[in-house]
Design a protein with these regions (language model features):
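Glyoxalase I/VOC metalloenzyme domain signal
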Residues: 1-5, 11-30, 47-267
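Short, solvent-exposed beta-strand-to-loop segments that form ligand-recognition rims
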Residues: 34
Length: 267
């Protein structure tokens, strides 16, 4: 059973600058470490609801090996992917495969934190054009509490000056020709029908699903001049907007320059 969003991936060009900029926006940013063999390093923004944002960048010099994040960076960076947390990763992977998602074979990854602690987990990711539309899945081999910053290890790691308390809504931009297939994947895998949702502010409409405490919105364009249509023209189907839950803090859309291209709303 899916229990919610584990984390949301935000791809940035320069991790050090992103850490400073997100800190200036009122987030507590914790350095995550390096991913051996992948050529990336990250920093994390953890929330009280257990979800977190992963700021991730290629370590200079960027290797010429093709990676789908390069197109995201070429379009300014920002929201790129998301991971779902599950009671049983193997069962969820099979359910999504049965529904039509092209999820590849699980593989092991690791990250070495700045304090030397080595985190190990298994990932299963989508391998076709729906990557970023269907989630990837994770199974921890080391404790999740070591992977995700917590107050016991980093003082006030999950407390933010801007009042951010957790993920609320992740909106996904999906092309008209792909929308029905994407909706079917979720409906079959989750065993329920999505509820109709309209997002005039993004120029889209579609369906929404509750995944634990988090809402996923699958949106197709309704306005050729809207944000969803523009996103589809520049980078295809992908996460387009994240709404964060706040606890009495600042409300509204964060400056896109400070978020390195990620459309983030505080509500």
């Amino acid at each position: 059973m899916l229990r919610g969003i584990d984390h949301i991936v935000i791809v940035v060009n320069d991790l050090e600058i992103a850490i400073a900029d997100y800190g200036a926006l009122g987030f507590t940013v914790v350095r995550g470490g390096r991913h051996p063999g992948l050529g990336t390093h990250n920093a994390l923004i953890a929330f009280a609801d257990g979800a977190y944002l992963e700021l991730i960048a290629f370590i200079p010099p960027v290797a010429p090996t093709p990676h789908w994040w390069h197109s995201t960076l070429a379009d300014g960076g920002g929201l790129a992917d998301f991971c779902a947390v599950s009671d049983d990763m193997d069962a969820e992977v099979e359910a999504f495969r049965h529904a039509g998602a092209a999820i590849g074979a699980p593989f092991e990854m690791s990250r070495e934190r700045p304090d030397g602690y080595r985190l190990v987990w298994t990932l299963a990711v989508t391998e076709d054009a729906r990557r970023g539309i269907t989630p990837f899945f994770i199974r921890d081999h080391t404790p999740r509490d070591e992977r995700v910053p917590r107050d016991e290890r980093v003082p006030r790691a999950r407390t933010h000056r801007n009042g951010a308390a957790g993920a609320r809504v992740l909106a996904l931009a999906i092309g008209e020709t792909e929308f029905d297939a994407a909706r079917r994947i979720y409906e079959v895998a989750l065993g329920r029908t999505g509820e109709t949702v309209e997002r005039a502010d993004l120029g889209g409409a579609g369906v929404r699903f509750m995944i634990g405490p988090h809402e996923l919105q699958l949106l197709a364009p309704t306005d050729p001049a809207g944000a969803i249509a523009r996103r589809l023209r520049t980078r295809g189907g992908s996460p387009i907007e994240l709404t964060l839950r706040t606890a009495g803090g600042w409300r509204g859309m964060l400056d896109a320059a400070g978020t390195h291209g990620a459309r983030i709303v505080m509500a």
